Amino acid sequence: MQRRTTALYFSPTGGTRTYVRAVAAAMPHMGGEVDLTRPEERRKVHMFGADDVVVLGVPVYYGRVPEVPGLLDGLQGEETPAVLLAVYGNRLIDDALAELSDLCAARGFRPLAAGAFVAPHTFSAKVAVGRPNAGDLAAAAELGRRAAEKLSGPVRWRPSILPRPVRPTVRSASAAWPVSGLARRAADGWKAPPLPLQWLIWRRH
């Protein structure tokens, strides 16, 4: 089966988009991308079948998937393999990957692989500047290659190995800041020391 790869991302400052493209480029039959940062794209219905594979990435806000209206509402899979990315500002990803996995599974996607990657922190001009670097992008490409290898043969799906339970979402006034305001806070400055890249694979047995 020749699967078509589609890159999907919400990326106000561009870091998540860079990682998603690096992962997707290492997978076969790249079919295009959907920029969920654009409200008009979030209002559309994007349907994927069992012969597709998606690479979906979001930044981590307050340890969770961003509370953006309709962020994933237009996505619909049908047993569609998904590679999931959470991009964080060199602190912690908290429950973001687990939450993203649950949200995608509820929309018909099958999480196949997942990774957490570092990009400049949205709220600081000094944290994680210069990321992603060459090593980060090489690791992202490796994740894409290994995910593609898993899809080259029969896949036996199993429940997520991400930590549970996911903490309840706490909504606050700060969580409702406009996305454009968040994007404007990204700036250059001191380069944070690198943390070990964290990534994991849903294994095939």
State what each model feature region is.
Residues 178-196, 205:
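Iron-sulfur cluster-binding cysteine motifs and their immediate structural context
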Residues 9-10, 172:
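Short, flexible coil/turn micro-motifs enriched in small/turn-prone residues
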Residues 2-7, 13-39, 44-164, 193:
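FMN-binding flavodoxin-like domain, especially the glycine-rich phosphate-binding loop
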Residues 162-172:
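Charge-patterned, long linear interaction tracts outside catalytic cores
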Residues 1-2, 199-204:
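Intrinsically disordered, compositionally biased regulatory regions
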Residues 170-180:
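Residues immediately within or flanking Cys/His clusters that coordinate Zn2+
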